């Protein structure tokens, strides 16, 4: 049993070594000419290093999208709506050199141009004060100094208090309720 387990371990190790070996680098190793950063594409050609901080990765992503080794549905990304009609069109079939630096083929968009019409109404509100408070679960949310205009509220910000909840009808929280509901019975005083 030990001999079969050892043979299996040796076979798995040999398989891993064979699968991870790169035949191009074994033949090209010659003293000082070998560079650990050199890479080869699917056709066996050396790829140039575009820059030292990942330029090679950009090239590899470009080659993966247009290589014949990747199936069409994997290299093709999501469709986008055409600006010329309601029909959804696939990605443009222009060569990678003509479709932008990253080869996306997508029209570049600014964050402000994103269509937010399908989002909730809460997202469209820019300020918390614009939210409609009429549907709040408690009916006692009131503002003090509601007779002041919004200009006065901004001008006298220190005099304008935060929103408050009216708790005067509860036994705790107002002077009026302390007279009505004392904590100690009157006959003990």
Swiss-Prot record:
Residues 1-21 form the signal peptide. Coiled coil: none annotated. Orcokinin-like peptide: Expressed in corpora cardiaca (CC), corpora allata (CA), antennal lobe (AL) and gnathal ganglion (GNG) (at protein level). Expression in CC, CA and GNG detected in some animals, in AL in few animals (at protein level). Orcokinin-like peptide precursor-related peptide: Expressed in corpora cardiaca (CC), corpora allata (CA), antennal lobe (AL) and gnathal ganglion (GNG) (at protein level). Expression in GNG detected in most animals, expression in CC, CA and AL detected in some animals (at protein level). One of its GO terms (biological process) is neuropeptide signaling pathway. One of its GO terms (cellular component) is extracellular region. Residues 22-124, 145-174 form a propeptide. Keywords: Cleavage on pair of basic residues, Neuropeptide, Secreted, Signal. It is found in: Secreted. Myotropic peptides. Belongs to the orcokinin family. This is Orcokinin peptides. The lineage of its organism: Eukaryota, Metazoa, Ecdysozoa, Arthropoda, Hexapoda.
